[in-house]
Amino acid sequence: MSNNSSTSFKNQKPVEPIGIIPRSIIRTFNRFIIQLFPNSNALVIQEFRISRYQVFVSIQCLLSLIFIPLIITFLSKTFVFLPLTEYVWNTQTDDIFLNSYLEKEALSELQDFEEQLYFDYFVSPNTYETPNWASYQISTDSSSQLESSFNNFPEILKSEIQKKTLELATHYNQKSIESLTNLFSDFVSFGTFALLVIILKPQIIILKSFLIESIYSLSDTIKSFLLILGTDLLVGFHSPRGWELFLEFVLNRFGFPHDENFIFLFVATLPVLLDTVFKYWIFRYLNKISPSTVATYHAMLE
């Protein structure tokens, strides 16, 4: 008896096909029919076990897809890529900057520091020896001006500039190493995620079914609210600034140059493409699956 029950449980599919009619309605109707039969208690228990198994597998799959790539990325970055990159970068190359953008950024920061020293030097004459006011020119955009003004500095200010230069060199050398390390570790993270998608394909099908069923169980108002919230965050009026910050974060993470033309082009085109995809999805699929949600969505927009 128990063997037949376990065999029947294993043969039962935890994923139901998706049709035009929401599965919540079909499931409610099936439960009503099942309760009309004498052995309805056993079937209800079996259905409960299937639902519990579906929830357990979905949570396990979701946590695996999130935390396994993060853990592997952290371990590979800390114990493999970072020491290896530091060794190769500091011993096999003479470069400090990964690209010219980081070099210009360091030079600009050094010039700002020099101008701050000029300001402090002029407003606090008692702190340093009396300056020769006619010999000072604030450097703005030239390394030669920086060098000539450096020669006019007192020794204490020269030491401050030298100290700041060493700090910037160390900082940007480490930043170049971290940029390369982030590139390698993120590539490993992406590969790990793709491998998990292939290995956990049955569990992902169950997870997808669980998420769709959970969304279907929501009311039309809540579904419309979530739809408006998602579209406004991605393609709304204030979304370009968010996309700009996201792109700057990606460029800083990998040490890529900040090309303003590329950033403006990205911000101007991607929200438009996403808005077109959302509208097509609402018209093509959501209008067939849940017309009431589409009606509520348009009513809330108006």
From Swiss-Prot:
Location relative to the cell: Plastid, Chloroplast inner membrane
Swiss-Prot/TrEMBL catalytic activity: K(+)(in) + H(+)(out) = K(+)(out) + H(+)(in)
Membrane-spanning residues: 55-75, 187-207, 225-247, 262-282
GO biological process per UniProt: potassium ion transport
GO molecular function: antiporter activity; proton transmembrane transporter activity
Role noted for this protein: Contributes to K(+)/H(+) antiport activity by supporting proton efflux to control proton extrusion and homeostasis in chloroplasts in a light-dependent manner to modulate photosynthesis. Prevents excessive induction of non-photochemical quenching (NPQ) under continuous-light conditions. Indirectly promotes efficient inorganic carbon uptake into chloroplasts.
Family: Belongs to the CemA family.
Protein name, entry field: Potassium/proton antiporter CemA
